[in-house]
Amino acid sequence: MSLTPHGGVLINRVNEEYDLSTVAKEIELDAISFADLELIAIGGYSPIEGFLTKADYEAVVSSMRLASGVVWSLPITLPVTKEKAAEIHQGDIVRLSYNGTVYGVIEVEDQYTPDKEKEAVNVYKTDDRNHPGVKKLFERGDTYIGGKITLTKRSEKPFPQFTYEPEETRRHFKENGWKTIVGFQTRNPVHRAHEYIQKTALETVDGLFLNPLVGETKSDDIPADVRMKSYQVLLNGYYPKDRVFLGVFPAAMRYAGPKEAIFHALVRKNYGCTHFIVGRDHAGVGDYYGTYEAQELFEQFTSEEIGITPLKFEHSFYCNTCEAMATPKTCPHDKSEHVILSGTKVRTMLRNGELPPSTFSRKEVIETLIEGLKTTVS
């Protein structure tokens, strides 16, 4: 399979020589839009070249496609307050700043008032304000600004040694001779169930791209710096160094379940992956989505439309009788013999000061997490 970016071309909207002297108006971004700005500019969100215009937004919300017909499952928008929107007009070029520093500009093509109730139900499958993605949606501005962006300044990265743009990951894969690469998305520490499906996938491809999300997440998720230490410990001790590549994904978590799974796959395609692991309740939260709903959503599109192969894994567990990791496909034993692993369960145990058993996670990983969380709390 070729490593063609989504839409056919890897977008590059970076111009650090851009003359800002004549640009007066300014929009202050939140953490989500700031991460999106950079990811649009470096091609992570190809074929998108800016924050969605009304036509693209409505097409994505209603049909999971851009107005051009290209598959795209999540609306990437720039929300502003009504007061800020009143200052901005079609044709304006507006600075985009974060924490007082200008990082880019947007060429305003339009501004529009979204139907947030419809967006919530169509994207998140609920309008329940207790859902973290829905809550965030309604907290943000009520007017959306659409238009192409230019990144005029790259930000300082929290994990510079693990930060790669799509052009760089593609080059790395090529230099290593990898023709097939499987991407793995996570916002959790890697537990034994993750390790099992990653290594099972690695048996069939040339390389694994471990691409943990380090943008904005829920307050009860394990902090990114603690997770990054745990990934390094795990990879150094239990994975072949020449078959795995660790790089961060700086986007915010949307918790949009099935539609975010499609989005995660398309983005990893842009980073150069040919395959993408889709496990149980991918990008889910609480009980809002079915266990395998994300996997089923991929069936709505042809392989040509998606352009990346989903590797669908059933719920894996540790079987006391098998004395090994397994899934319902490979283990005949009763559920009473199964130790169910999940990131939520590991997080809860760690927060409560409990030591998860070795069937949950590698000893070195647990030690790293406990030490990291102590530092975070203190």
Swiss-Prot record:
<comment type="similarity">
    <text>Belongs to the sulfate adenylyltransferase family.</text>
</comment>
<keyword id="KW-0547">Nucleotide-binding</keyword>
<dbReference type="InterPro" id="IPR002650">
    <property type="entry name" value="Sulphate_adenylyltransferase"/>
</dbReference>
<dbReference type="GO" id="GO:0005524">
    <property type="term" value="F:ATP binding"/>
</dbReference>
<keyword id="KW-0808">Transferase</keyword>
<keyword id="KW-0067">ATP-binding</keyword>
<keyword id="KW-0548">Nucleotidyltransferase</keyword>
<dbReference type="InterPro" id="IPR020792">
    <property type="entry name" value="SO4_adenylyltransferase_pro"/>
</dbReference>
<dbReference type="Pfam" id="PF01747">
    <property type="entry name" value="ATP-sulfurylase"/>
</dbReference>
<dbReference type="GO" id="GO:0004781">
    <property type="term" value="F:sulfate adenylyltransferase (ATP) activity"/>
</dbReference>
<dbReference type="GO" id="GO:0000103">
    <property type="term" value="P:sulfate assimilation"/>
</dbReference>
<dbReference type="InterPro" id="IPR024951">
    <property type="entry name" value="Sulfurylase_cat_dom"/>
</dbReference>
<comment type="pathway">
    <text>Sulfur metabolism; hydrogen sulfide biosynthesis; sulfite from sulfate: step 1/3.</text>
</comment>
<dbReference type="InterPro" id="IPR015947">
    <property type="entry name" value="PUA-like_sf"/>
</dbReference>
<dbReference type="GO" id="GO:0070814">
    <property type="term" value="P:hydrogen sulfide biosynthetic process"/>
</dbReference>
<protein>
    <recommendedName>
        <fullName>Sulfate adenylyltransferase</fullName>
        <ecNumber>2.7.7.4</ecNumber>
    </recommendedName>
</protein>
<dbReference type="Pfam" id="PF14306">
    <property type="entry name" value="PUA_2"/>
</dbReference>
<dbReference type="InterPro" id="IPR025980">
    <property type="entry name" value="ATP-Sase_PUA-like_dom"/>
</dbReference>
<dbReference type="InterPro" id="IPR014729">
    <property type="entry name" value="Rossmann-like_a/b/a_fold"/>
</dbReference>
